[in-house]
Amino acid sequence: MCTMPLMKLKKMMRRTAFLLSVLIGCSMLGSDRSDKAPHWELVWSDEFDYSGLPDPEKWDYDVGGHGWGNQELQYYTRARIENARVGGGVLIIEARHEPYEGREYTSARLVTRGKASWTYGRFEIRARLPSGRGTWPAIWMLPDRQTYGSAYWPDNGEIDIMEHVGFNPDVVHGTVHTKAYNHLLGTQRGGSIRVPTARTDFHVYAIEWTPEEIRWFVDDSLYYRFPNERLTDPEADWRHWPFDQPFHLIMNIAVGGAWGGQQGVDPEAFPAQLVVDYVRVYRWVE
């Protein structure tokens, strides 16, 4: 009798199908490129097929409990198994209600900064979101350095692949912030989509970032586009589109905060988990 957990078995089946598709794509590389259609090519991934802490070759941590510019309540810990761990084929980021370093909650904020960054590409994350008032999971991107303007943020941009706030369950948001378009001015640009099973089932949250635009998807359903105005408006500049430089990935659960805590925090909602099946990054090949 098979005793393998159903979730892990399904993951292995998806992983096998994914590897077959990659192998087929690789076998085509030897063919005449004039006959090969443009496509997305995998360049980086974490399938979480191991156990323990997140792979230190791929992930680092943002650490601290200073509110993170959003009046957040959690302390982000470093390499603490209670807050970030891999097992059963998934990554679990867990926010907990517990005293730690002067804060009432703990969580983790994983980053690829210093490990991997990209300019343009398709970024694909299969995840199940946490429940509960006061939870604020996010999968997003920030630039590696300050290239434009007098401030790192918002001058150099932010790409929110997926955000969800617990007081507005099953509504997923995709947003950009720039010098011209940001929440401090009330001018941020983005879209939202209802995902009725976001907290009970896994869904694929993705963006496709090109020199022309950024596109947001849930399960390959397009729900928002942000165009590069510098290509059509002679007055537009980096203030409108700073997205021509390397960005790194971030995954976290915040607690409370200016947005996530608008209707308070329910302590009974914790521990709360953002569960990630995989993270995949592709580049466009002509």
UniProtKB/Swiss-Prot annotation:
Keyword Hydrolase among UniProt keywords: yes
UniProt signal peptide: 1-30
Q: Which Enzyme Commission number(s) are on file for it?
A: 3.2.1.73
Per UniProt, residues of the GH16 domain are 48-286
GO BP field: carbohydrate metabolic process
Temperature-dependent activity: Optimum temperature is 85 degrees Celsius.
Entries under Pfam families matching the protein: Glyco_hydro_16 (PF00722)
Which cystines does this chain contain? Answer: none
Residues annotated as catalytic: 158, 163
Recall the GO molecular function terms of this protein's record: licheninase activity
Could you tell me how activity relates to pH for this protein?
Answer: Optimum pH is 7.0.
Q: Which reaction does it catalyse?
A: Hydrolysis of (1->4)-beta-D-glucosidic linkages in beta-D-glucans containing (1->3)- and (1->4)-bonds
Q: Which InterPro entries match?
A: ConA-like_dom_sf, GH16, GH16_AS, Glycosyl_Hydrlase_16
Protein keywords: Glycosidase, Hydrolase, Signal
Family per similarity comment: Belongs to the glycosyl hydrolase 16 family.
Function noted in UniProt = Shows activity on lichenan, beta-glucan and laminarin but not on CMC cellulose or xylan.
Listed name of the protein: Beta-glucanase
Instruction: Provide the organism lineage as a comma list.
Output: Bacteria, Pseudomonadati, Rhodothermota, Rhodothermia, Rhodothermales
